[in-house]
């Protein structure tokens, strides 16, 4: 009985690690660089959704980006409905909140969602235009 219990515990740990690695790989596949985001955006092939707070947005933002703070994203999804089948790039300060936004949008049925690596900080460091 003890051997079976140990086997079950070990199996559970291996399974949990497998899902964790798979999730990390999925998020990596959904990430794009600021340069890639800029190119998609400039060619009107994508919309950028900035999920930072109002104070962060007012300080600096990407021209033409849609501003919806992460805490309001679920209730404001109807504002993004027209982009459901278009590429949507989520962006925040460093990439953490935008990764959460990516999950929200995918769960809501958005099919082409990307998280911009490094957020507005990486965009600015790349010398790309901000307001």
Show the residue positions of the predicted features.
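Rhodanese-like catalytic fold shared by cysteine-dependent sulfurtransferases
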Residues: 2-10, 19-46, 55-87, 93-131
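Structural scaffold elements adjacent to functional motifs in cytosolic proteins
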Residues: 48-50
């Amino acid at each position: 009985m003890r051997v079976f219990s140990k086997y079950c515990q070990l199996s559970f740990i291996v399974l949990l690690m497998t899902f964790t690695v798979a999730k990390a790989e999925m998020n990596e596949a959904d990430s794009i660089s600021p340069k890639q985001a800029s190119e998609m955006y400039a060619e009107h092939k994508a919309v950028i959704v900035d999920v930072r707070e109002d104070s962060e947005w007012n300080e600096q933002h990407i021209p033409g980006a849609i501003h919806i703070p992460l805490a309001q994203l679920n209730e404001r999804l109807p504002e993004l409905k027209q982009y459901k089948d278009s590429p949507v790039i989520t962006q925040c300060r460093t990439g953490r909140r935008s990764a959460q936004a990516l999950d929200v949008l995918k769960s809501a049925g958005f099919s082409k969602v990307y998280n911009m690596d490094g957020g507005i900080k990486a965009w600015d460091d790349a010398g790309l235009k901000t307001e």
